[in-house]
UniProtKB/Swiss-Prot annotation:
InterPro entries: Homeodomain-like_sf (IPR009057), Myb_CC_LHEQLE (IPR025756), Myb_dom_plants (IPR006447), PHR1-like (IPR046955), SANT/Myb (IPR001005). GO terms for cellular component: nucleus. Belongs to the MYB-CC family. GO terms for biological process: regulation of DNA-templated transcription. Pfam families: Myb_CC_LHEQLE (PF14379), Myb_DNA-binding (PF00249). This is Myb family transcription factor PHL8. Residues 62-87 bind DNA. It is found in: Nucleus. Residues 31-91 form the HTH myb-type domain. A motif (LHEQLE) lies at residues 152-157. Residues 110-120 have a biased composition (Basic and acidic residues).
Length: 336
């Protein structure tokens, strides 16, 4: 019971002290024509405690503050205006804090950006040095490739020129062979010499078609000489001329032997048979004249024989063909 009495006494004492404090707290008004309330430090501290009890400036209301504070003479108008100012101050502080935080974050971002820029600058310098080396290597490789391509193009052009020249040479030889065959086809006589020439021309044409234009002309000249000798001997006039040549040669040899014999006889019998020597000399003069006459007769016969026959045209065509073939070989050597 004693304890209960003490607790009640303490409570009464606290209430009395609070009432005394409220009574002591008097409002301070300004001396203007329209007096205004001055918020002292104690009054403002009391206001802050009441706001915190109500849950902060956003939840506190002027009526709630009036009930909590319980100060006589304090009106809703005074609490409302002071609460608005308090809220503005809090918001300004909050904005200032935000600005400080944002400025700090911005400073950090700027510093991070600067650091990243520095790192990028170092990496860029390294990358710039590496691409420079790579660029030099690429340019050298491109130059080498261009040189190789130029050499290949030059070789291709040379091969084209050689191919064109070889084709032109083959066409020329084919045209020459066609002309020779046409000239041979114009002759109506079908003797062995013509057949032989045709076979040789066909053989040369086949060689040209097979790609052997630069054949040796020794065979061709040998064939032509054999053909000319065969054709010349085949003529009846030429046969007579050959017989005359043989007879003249035999007579000349016999006359020479007789002359040598007579010279020896004359040397032995000079002093004895002078008239016989004169007779023999006259006889020998007559024999020489007859031999010269025979030789003189032989030459126009040969000229007439070579100038009349149609086979002479064949010889001329073969000679021209041989010259054309020699010219073709010279052209081929010039190409090579």
């Amino acid at each position: 019971m004693c304890l209960l009495m003490e607790i009640n006494n303490n409570a009464n004492n606290t209430n009395t002290t609070i009432d005394n404090h409220k009574a002591k707290m008097s409002l301070v008004l300004s001396t203007d024509a329209k007096p205004r309330l001055k918020w002292t430090c104690d009054l403002h501290h009391k206001f802050i405690e009441a706001v915190n009890q109500l849950g902060g400036p956003n939840k506190a209301t002027p009526k709630g503050l009036m009930k909590v504070m319980e100060i006589p003479g304090l009106t809703l108008y005074h609490l409302k205006s002071h609460l608005q100012k308090y809220r503005l101050g809090k918001s300004m502080k909050f904005d200032d804090n935000k600005l400080e935080v944002s400025s700090a974050s911005e400073n950090q971002e700027v510093e991070s950006k600067n650091d990243s820029r520095d790192l990028r600058g170092c990496s860029v310098t390294e990358e710039n040095s590496n691409p420079a080396k790579e660029g030099l290597q690429i340019t050298e490789a491109l130059q080498m490739q261009m040189e190789v391509q130029k050499k290949l193009h030059e070789q291709i052009e040379v091969q084209r020129h050689l191919q064109v020249k070889i084709e032109a040479q083959g066409k020329y030889l084919q045209s020459v062979l066609m002309k020779a065959q046409q000239t041979l086809a114009g002759y109506s006589s079908s003797n062995l010499g013509m057949d032989f020439a045709r076979t040789e021309l066909s053989r040369l044409a086949s060689m040209v078609n097979r790609g052997c234009p630069s054949t040796s002309f020794s065979e061709l000249t040998q064939v032509e000489e054999e053909e000319e000798g065969f054709l010349w001997y085949k003529k009846p006039e030429n046969r007579g001329i050959s017989q005359l040549r043989c007879s003249v040669e035999s007579s000349l040899t016999s006359s020479e032997t007789s002359e040598t014999k007579l010279d020896t006889d004359n040397n032995l019998n000079k002093s004895i048979e002078l008239p016989l020597m004169e007779i023999n000399s006259e006889v020998m003069k007559g024999k020489k004249r007859s031999i010269n006459d025979v030789v003189c007769v032989e030459q126009p016969l040969m000229k007439r024989a070579f100038g009349v026959d149609d086979d002479e045209h064949l010889k001329l065509s073969l000679n021209t063909y041989k010259k054309d073939m020699e010219a073709c070989t010279n052209i081929g050597l010039g190409f090579n």
